[in-house]
Design a protein with these regions (language model features):
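A residue-level marker of the well-folded mature domains of exported/periplasmic proteins
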Residues: 1-210
Length: 210
């Protein structure tokens, strides 16, 4: 999924500018999915002759804003931005529009109104609803369909990367919907924010299972 998404992002860049320098802002490097994504992106773009610089936002939106401004000052021909915070989309879009830099937003989808604010802006992401459905189907494919204790329902802990993120919302909704559509009774025991952090997710699970 990461490789195909990276290829789509690269295609969006080539549609906007032929050659030149591309600045890539990743919300944080310490994320397995985004590591695969950025490595694939760099390989694809450099293979097409682009000069690529990728920076780590360290999960800090203020730092990422500075990185975007630095890239603009350096005169990049295009930007690829994986926002730290979904709520920062307005500011990011205003900045790149003011600089007239073609920009690809990845992995955290803005609203339709935000996307329409700048004609050189595109979004590339996975089908989050489909991803959520696949997650639910994985549970349905287990021997007991997720009903481990045999009480006739699937009791679950839901860990969301970021509740403000549209993709996270859709994955949450459709993973559960896949179960209920199959006639499975469900019970949510806990809903926590995990910030796409494996250690935090493990800690939440350990606390809930204690």
């Amino acid at each position: 999924a990461a490789e195909s998404a990276a290829e789509s992002a690269a295609e969006s860049v080539t549609a906007a500018t032929q050659g030149g320098k591309v600045g890539v802002c990743i919300y944080k490097f310490d994320d397995a999915f985004m590591t695969t994504y950025r490595n694939a992106l760099q390989e694809i773009l450099e293979g097409k002759g682009y000069e690529v610089t990728i920076v780590d936002g360290n999960n800090d939106q203020a730092k990422q804003n500075e990185q975007i401004n630095t890239f603009i000052t350096q005169g990049v021909d295009a930007l690829i931005i994986n926002p730290v915070m979904t709520s920062a989309a307005d500011q990011i879009i205003s900045t790149v529009k003011g600089a007239d830099v073609p920009t690809v937003l990845i992995n955290r989808e803005p609203t339709a109104d935000q996307m329409s604010a700048y004609d050189k802006l595109v979004y590339v992401g996975c089908d989050a609803a489909q991803s959520g459905t696949f997650q639910g189907e994985l549970i349905l494919d287990t021997e007991n369909k997720g009903d481990i204790n045999g009480d006739g329902k699937v009791s679950y802990i839901m860990i969301q990367g970021d509740p403000e993120n549209i993709d996270a919302q859709l994955r949450t909704e459709y993973s559960v919907k896949a179960l209920t559509d199959a006639g499975v009774e469900v019970e949510q025991l806990d809903l926590q924010r995990g910030d796409w952090d494996r250690n935090k997710g493990q800690e939440i699970c350990q606390n809930d299972l204690a």
